[in-house]
A protein has these predicted regions:
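Histidine-anchored nucleotide/phosphate-binding helix
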Residues: 9-27, 146, 303-318
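Catalytic donor nucleotide-activated moiety binding site of glycosyltransferases and closely related
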Residues: 312-356
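Conserved N-terminal ligand/cofactor-binding loop architecture of enzyme catalytic domains
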Residues: 22-118, 161-259, 263-264
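Long, C-terminal catalytic modules of enzymes
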Residues: 402-446
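Active-site donor-nucleotide binding/catalytic segment of nucleotide-sugar enzymes
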Residues: 279-308, 313-315, 328-332, 437
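Nucleotide-activated donor-dependent transferases that construct or modify glycoconjugates
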Residues: 1-13, 35-37, 106, 133, ...
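Conserved nucleotide-sugar donor-interacting segment of glycosyltransferase catalytic cores
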Residues: 119-181
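A donor-sugar binding/catalytic signature common to diverse glycosyltransferases
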Residues: 134-135, 141, 160, 357-404
Length: 446
């Protein structure tokens, strides 16, 4: 009997490690692991006895110093072989674009890194594993390996949070159900909107995220300890991990001081210029900003990363009697909010108003006429509050008749008008929530 091979992608959160520990007690398979962690964490994985991995690859050990003599022919054939757009992933990589405040990568450096990554992954896949088990990708190289696995016949089993708190899903693609039943094929529990809203409150993911954000915001001890450890430890990581290029101690400390000041100034600006009370005297469409940088745009919706342009497109597409309300993402506080110039440009658009992050999303959903989102769960929450939604990227709840998956920006004016006339049926939402519960498990990823 052939022993199946399973590859785990471990990014330092121990999720894949603990899952492998549990799985090895139940099945007889060969376990392999790609470990994507900084240098100082390698020792733990080298000495751990939780899982008997047949082989471990430390991701950054496979990446050499960037060089100028890049094998473009290899990268060209790689793209064709795996149907992967490398520049799409590379230019949306937070380490390679404007979100990296410490180092600006050149074209040659990026191509050199891509070449090393792709060649390393091909060598690993030569083992012909049957499964990839991993948390959803955050960085471009993780997503490249995920896509390579699918093309190579390796079945991905990807952990991601459900939109229901304390539950997670295991699917081939994050936020895309493997269960392809339509709404018409599903069973309803005959819940009305009041019952659905009570159910949603019971499993409200926003509260779980909010608790995590508050903990990160208020807890100073871990930050102080991390800062002291950084100051008094050696800093060799900037030499052998491209994610830390440019992170000298002087730059890091200077960046910390500057961003703390910016955070306060930005918060003061929002307090002064954002609406804290919803003015519903005129009907409005609601667009929540996405936290950035995050995979929800950079990977899941890669052509919609410019949210200001998206807001302008929506504003241009509204019926004359409607306004657009835009709300800052509360978790953006963990990124020191956004540049004031970002907010100023939005406020300069006639018929657009920014809502303060402290306003509850539920209160907005009760008063808006339509929700438009690039990605994320707010479109489902809109349906629970009897409101139609438009979404710019693939998400499992787009099977709801009240949710329109936008295929082209040119169709936005027509779709907005059509969606404003769309009625949400409780039976459809009820069926979908049953489907979601069937396809998720009790497990807190946070």
């Amino acid at each position: 009997m052939v022993t199946e091979k399973i590859i785990f992608w471990e990014s330092g959160n121990f999720l894949s490690l603990f899952f492998a520990n549990s799985l090895q007690k139940k099945i007889n398979s060969e376990f392999y692991a790609i470990i994507d962690v900084p240098e100082r964490q390698k020792l733990f994985y080298q000495k751990q006895k939780l899982v008997d991995f047949k082989k471990i690859w430390f991701f950054h050990d496979g990446i050499s110093k960037p060089r100028k003599n890049v094998d473009i022919d290899f990268l060209t054939s790689f793209e064709e072989k795996y149907n992967i757009n490398l520049w799409l992933l590379a230019l949306n990589e937070r380490l390679f674009n404007e979100y990296n405040e410490f180092y600006k990568f050149s074209r040659e450096e990026i191509l050199s890194i891509l070449e090393d990554e792709c060649k390393m992954f091909e060598k690993i896949l030569a083992l012909k594993p049957k499964f990839l088990i991993s948390y959803k990708s955050t960085f471009h190289h993780h997503e490249i390996f995920h896509q390579m696995c699918k093309i190579s016949g390796v079945k991905p089993l990807i952990f991601s949070a459900s939109v229901l708190a304390n539950r997670c899903m295991i699917t081939e693609e994050p936020n895309i159900l493997d269960d392809k039943r339509t709404i018409e094929e599903l069973q309803s529990s005959n819940r009305d909107f009041n019952a659905l809203q009570k159910y949603w409150k019971k499993f409200e993911l926003r509260k779980q995220f909010g608790d995590t954000t508050d903990t990160l915001r208020k807890s100073k001890t871990p930050k102080i300890n991390a800062g002291l450890d950084f100051v008094f430890s050696s800093n060799t990581i900037i030499e052998n991990n491209y994610g830390y290029y440019g992170h000298t101690k002087r730059k890091a400390l200077s960046n910390y001081v500057v961003t703390r000041m910016k955070k306060k100034n930005r918060n003061d600006y929002m307090d002064k210029n954002f609406l804290k009370v919803i003015d519903d005297s005129t009907p409005f469409v609601y667009f929540p900003l996405h936290q950035m940088p995050e995979r929800e745009l950079l990977i899941a919706s890669p052509f919609n990363t410019n949210q200001i342009e998206t807001i302008k497109h929506i504003a241009k597409s509204l019926p004359i009697g409607y306004r657009l309300f835009v709300k800052e993402h509360p978790s953006q506080v963990t990124r020191e909010w956004r540049d004031i110039s970002f907010y100023e440009e939005i406020l300069s658009i006639p018929n657009v108003q920014l809502l303060h992050y402290s306003i509850k999303s539920e209160d907005i959903l009760k008063k808006c006429s339509l929700v438009i989102t690039i990605h994320g769960a707010v479109g489902l929450e809109a349906a629970i509050h009897k409101k139609p939604a438009i979404i710019f990227s693939d998400f499992f709840y787009s099977i709801l008749p009240s949710v329109h998956r936008l295929q082209s920006i040119e169709e936005l004016p027509r779709v907005i008008r059509s969606s404003l006339r769309t009625k949400v049926h409780a039976s459809d939402v009820d069926k979908f929530l049953n489907l979601l519960e069937e396809n998720s498990i009790d497990f807190d990823l946070f």
